[in-house]
Amino acid sequence: MAVYTELAAETLEAFLGTYDIGTLVSFHGIAEGVENSNFLLRTTEGDFILTLFERRVNARELPWFLGLMQYLAGRGLNCPLPVSDRSGTALRSLADRPAAITTFLPGVSATQLDANLCLELGKVLARLHIAGEGYDAVRPNALSPAAWGPLLDSCGESGDELSPGLTAEVRKALQNVEAAWPATADLPRGQIHADLFPDNVFFQNGQVSGLIDFYFACTDFLAYDLAICLNAWCFRDEKTFEPSFAAAIMQGYESVRPLSDAEKAALPTLCQGAAIRFLLTRLYDWINTPADALVTRKDPLAYLRRLRHFQSASHV
């Protein structure tokens, strides 16, 4: 989450006047994340999240995201539920941007990861994949391997300013991953979160209390979602791979949804691909984020280290 677009209280009060969620008491921007502008709203009826959609989100796809969250919540997954206005509309416009209000989920994201939290993460990821069965609308992954080459090209040689030789190293890694990437029919596919980082998972008393930020969700390999989590959750201090964390995620996931042999064999390649994807989007954002945006820029080199780790790993 982040804030690129500022709002005046008067503008927000007028916007909320079309909803039955009480009157505005207070609001503030949320700086975590890098994609959309997010605000925590406190009204006389409770707390809500307002999202203004920016940048990579295609406005025509927003009904798909909102529909997915509604579907998952209906199947028992703790995720934000879109709030409709009095006319029954969940997707609106505010400050010349698409906007949506969702319910607020209790809990906090973990600041110190451990194997027990990773075990719970693995379980809930598998539950998400199972809960998504039956949501048949397809959203292709806009950040699939086909997008990585153009994304690298768009960064020019800026990566070499962060780390000499970065561009050539990533280009070679990308070629290798593309050559080994599974064909569409090779692995089970379904609805994936595609961005399930620790700041998108809330915990209470050691248990997952909610999953948020579904705006990269798409239809892709289920095991690729697992690979993203292995990248995001298993490196202490953004540097050192922690095998016990990876083992816990795998154990938790397979206790709910066992992996096929083909999925297990593909995981090293999928993990390299996930590292490339987040290295490139972080690099792009590092170069292009406005200096005055209320947003936390993320270090691209943390994912270069992950890429190198998974290149040297024969299994996960």
Swiss-Prot record:
Pathway: Amino-acid biosynthesis; L-threonine biosynthesis; L-threonine from L-aspartate: step 4/5
Keyword Transmembrane helix: no
GO molecular function terms attached to this record: ATP binding; homoserine kinase activity
SUPFAM superfamilies to which the protein is assigned, alphabetical: Protein kinase-like (PK-like) (SSF56112)
Keywords: Amino-acid biosynthesis, ATP-binding, Kinase, Nucleotide-binding, Threonine biosynthesis, Transferase
Enzyme class: transferase
S-S bridge residues: none
Listed EC numbers: 2.7.1.39
UniProt cross-references to InterPro entries, sorted A to Z: Aminoglycoside_PTrfase (IPR002575), Homoserine_kinase_II (IPR005280), Kinase-like_dom_sf (IPR011009), Pseudomonas-type_ThrB (IPR050249)
Matches recorded under Pfam families: APH
Catalytic activity: L-homoserine + ATP = O-phospho-L-homoserine + ADP + H(+)
Protein family according to the UniProt entry: Belongs to the pseudomonas-type ThrB family.
Designated name of the protein: Homoserine kinase
Organism: Gluconobacter oxydans (strain 621H) (Gluconobacter suboxydans)
Lineage of the organism: Bacteria, Pseudomonadati, Pseudomonadota, Alphaproteobacteria, Acetobacterales
